[in-house]
Amino acid sequence: MDNDQYLKNMQTLFASEFAFYLKAANFHWNVEGSDFYEFHLLFERIYNEVFESVDIFAEELRALKSYAPASLGILNELSIIMGQDQIPQPASMAQELLVDSDNLAELFRQGFDLAEQMGDHGLSNFLADRQDAHKKHSWMLRSTLK
């Protein structure tokens, strides 16, 4: 794989993580219902954890002499995470985040493999940590939905 394709893959990962952060924040801000407090706190925990990683990831991209995608148009174009314009019921919000988190865990696994192939061990460690974080988010969301 050439360096340009590698950077494009990392930018897609970054954009997808940012879109997931935004969706979790949206759900945190707008959740309603009898289980409001439980979902409100869960979504807050998720978006706070992901927000910290977005900043670190942007710095990792800059270390690769690449720019972090920063406009909403570019983020939306690159992301595998679909935005949510509606306000679903709390369980539907959690289910949507669960699917997205599972997809991100797999995307981060693939990113890890690419970083290892490129000999970028620092970034591969970060990507492995992100995969683990999304597995944990998925576990918490899945357990909440039972």
Segment roles from a protein language model:
Residues 35-74, 144:
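Conserved alpha-helical segments that form or flank metal/cofactor-binding pockets of metalloenzymes
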Residues 1-13, 90:
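Disorder-to-helix initiation segments
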Residues 37-38, 42-45, 68-85, 123-133:
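Charge-rich, acidic-biased intrinsically disordered regions
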Residues 16, 62-70, 100-103, 107:
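Alpha-helix capping/hinge segments and adjacent helical runs
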Residues 1-5, 20-45, 107-122:
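Helix-loop segments that flank and shape redox-cofactor active sites
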Residues 9, 55, 59, 76-128:
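Acidic/histidine-rich alpha-helical segments that form the ligand environment
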Residues 21, 28, 47, 54, ...:
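A structural signal for well-ordered alpha-helices, especially hydrophobic packing surfaces
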Residues 12-15, 45-52, 96-99, 103, ...:
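DHp/HisKA dimerization-phosphoacceptor four-helix bundle of two-component histidine kinases
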